[in-house]
């Protein structure tokens, strides 16, 4: 009844107009699952590799090769398998690929199959995905990290840091937190317009105004929070994605917008200064992806005061996370399903983090689709945090809307994480 009988792969477009892989998995009893794969702009060097076509078509970014691999080698390897045996399916693909970084089959091909199989298995059971994966204990609605100002690789402005986010930690429910975020977003738009600044939105729905420094961006967000009728640090906290690998050059953190340059110790002091000045509760990629000494120094300086999230540092890889836990680098992991390429490995990374006292943040990518799987995964794992962009663009709001549906399904059994999901 739950045997995989067919797999269909197609090339679709993501939110940036680039091709990506969508996969349908069909089962013997007629059950069905579908998943579309996201893609990043600023990618870590240690991420699993996407399969792209090369050549002139779509500027080399086509995924027809990946689709052929899904319908060919991958289908042959897992045809007839029980869709409810997720780990067996994922391990079969990992063995078939045979590389450390999924480079032979492509993480985009493998992930599409992995997630679609999970959706099909949930369909067999007649369960929503979060309940199928997480069981009866899946009931924590995550606190959102809402990206409202973009910089770095996500924007054409001088701001060195990639994302400036708000976290409505002081609201009583997910739906109220979402309303708060939307109201701050619109208050920020009004403030930027009044200052004569650009209010176009970037890849993740945040604004990309021409501001020169992190402090300028944080100041205008603080004003927007208050203008919307909320208290900074009480109702709404701040979070940063520094994406420091993007400006790490020859052992120095070069802030071109602010016209500053720091070694690891100096940059950790700079970040500490921001934490002292603003209600910042989370900093992502505060040090470069291979600056382990810098990460340890930053963690020693801010652990207990601020969540320190490893994205490029850990790339959702349990082996790199284990090294971080052992050496005292960071205190939380950003979880991106396409960084590792299978659902089983993603769940392993979350489990390792939470068991070790690390925080976990379920995350989108800058190139997204209408697929809302990560919303279900955030609830399934009870990780307590989700990062899925701003309060604009349907590729971002699709995840928030799915969480609203889940909140409604959970009813009184659901619990909003608030500040409790944070690692610090």
UniProtKB/Swiss-Prot annotation:
Required cofactor names: Mg(2+)
Annotated catalysed reactions: (2R)-2-phosphoglycerate = phosphoenolpyruvate + H2O
Top-rank EC class of the record's enzyme: lyase
PROSITE patterns: ENOLASE (PS00164)
Binding site for Mg(2+): 241, 284, 311
Record-linked Pfam families: Enolase_C, Enolase_N
Any one Gene Ontology cellular component term annotated for this protein: extracellular region
SMART domains, per database record: Enolase_C, Enolase_N
Task performed by this protein: Catalyzes the reversible conversion of 2-phosphoglycerate (2-PG) into phosphoenolpyruvate (PEP). It is essential for the degradation of carbohydrates via glycolysis.
Family matches, as NCBIfam families: eno
Family according to the record: Belongs to the enolase family.
HAMAP family with a match to the protein in the record: Enolase
Protein name as catalogued: Enolase
Biological source species: Maricaulis maris (strain MCS10)
Organism placement in taxonomy: Bacteria, Pseudomonadati, Pseudomonadota, Alphaproteobacteria, Maricaulales
């Amino acid at each position: 009844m739950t045997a995989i009988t067919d797999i269909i792969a197609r090339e679709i477009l993501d939110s940036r107009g680039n091709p990506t892989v969508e996969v349908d998995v069909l089962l013997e009893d007629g059950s069905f699952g579908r998943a579309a794969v996201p893609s990043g702009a600023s990618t870590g060097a240690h991420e699993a590799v996407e399969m792209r076509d090369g050549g002139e078509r779509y500027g080399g970014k086509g995924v027809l090769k990946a689709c052929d691999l899904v319908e060919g080698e991958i289908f042959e390897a897992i045809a007839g398998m029980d869709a409810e045996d997720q780990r067996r399916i994922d391990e079969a693909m990992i063995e078939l690929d045979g590389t450390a970084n999924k480079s032979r089959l492509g993480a985009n091909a493998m992930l599409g199959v992995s997630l679609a199989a999970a959706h099909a298995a949930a369909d067999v059971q007649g369960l929503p995905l979060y309940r199928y994966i997480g069981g009866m204990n899946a009931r924590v609605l995550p606190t959102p990290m809402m990206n409202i100002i973009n910089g770095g690789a996500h924007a054409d402005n001088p701001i060195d840091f990639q994302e400036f986010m708000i976290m409505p930690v002081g609201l009583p429910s997910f739906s109220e937190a979402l309303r708060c975020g939307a109201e701050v977003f619109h208050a920020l738009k009004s403030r930027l317009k009044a200052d004569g600044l650009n209010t176009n939105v970037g890849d993740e729905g945040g604004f990309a105004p021409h501001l020169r420094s992190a402090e300028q961006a944080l100041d205008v967000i603080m004003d927007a929070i208050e203008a919307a009728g909320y208290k900074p640090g009480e109702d709404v906290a701040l979070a940063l994605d520094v994406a420091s690998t993007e400006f790490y050059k020859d052992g120095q953190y070069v802030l071109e917008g602010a016209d500053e340059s720091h070694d690891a110790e100096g940059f950790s002091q700079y970040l500490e200064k921001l934490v002292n000045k603003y209600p910042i509760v989370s900093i992502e990629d505060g040090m470069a992806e291979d600056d382990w000494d810098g990460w340890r120094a930053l963690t020693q300086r801010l652990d207990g005061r601020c969540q320190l999230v490893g994205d490029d540092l850990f790339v959702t890889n349990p082996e790199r996370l284990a090294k971080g836990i052992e050496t005292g680098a960071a205190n939380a992991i950003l979880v991106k399903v396409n960084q590792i390429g299978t659902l089983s490995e993603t769940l392993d990374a979350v489990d390792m983090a939470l068991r070790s006292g690390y925080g976990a943040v379920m995350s989108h990518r800058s190139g997204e689709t209408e697929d809302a799987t990560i919303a279900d995964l955030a609830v399934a794992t009870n990780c307590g945090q989700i990062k899925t962009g701003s309060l604009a663009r349907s590729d971002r709001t699709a995840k928030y809307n799915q969480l609203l549906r889940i909140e409604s399904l959970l009813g009184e059994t659901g619990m909003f994480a608030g500040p409790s999901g944070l690692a610090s």
